């Protein structure tokens, strides 16, 4: 003889809250599942698929040719000699922030050609 859904519902209605909790725990254990509601995150995939449009160029090291890197920094940023020297010696430091991908790639190439170690974030 099989039990119908209605009979199960009637049996549940007759149980106390503690008995229902114990039943749920037993069902979780027997079937290897959780009664916790599944969390649905909306928009997470859309945000991940969205391409980054602003980049920061970070000088991680001035390398062996500090003078050439200082000259490249002065040309790229318009800083004075003292400010560019301080920037080169303060690595890691952001050279430019929130710039386009093309501008970031060009700046990175210029600084690397001068001997600096650069990363784009």
UniProtKB/Swiss-Prot annotation:
UniProt-recorded Gene Ontology molecular function terms: mRNA binding; structural constituent of ribosome
Keyword Lipid metabolism found: no
One Gene Ontology CC term in the entry: cytosolic large ribosomal subunit
Cross-referenced Pfam families: Ribosomal_L12, Ribosomal_L12_N
GO annotation, biological process: translation
The entry's keywords: Ribonucleoprotein, Ribosomal protein
Oligomer status and interactors: Homodimer. Part of the ribosomal stalk of the 50S ribosomal subunit. Forms a multimeric L10(L12)X complex, where L10 forms an elongated spine to which 2 to 4 L12 dimers bind in a sequential fashion. Binds GTP-bound translation factors.
Family, as annotated: Belongs to the bacterial ribosomal protein bL12 family.
Function, as annotated: Forms part of the ribosomal stalk which helps the ribosome interact with GTP-bound translation factors. Is thus essential for accurate translation.
Protein name as annotated: Large ribosomal subunit protein bL12
Species name: Shewanella halifaxensis (strain HAW-EB4)
Name of the coding gene: rplL
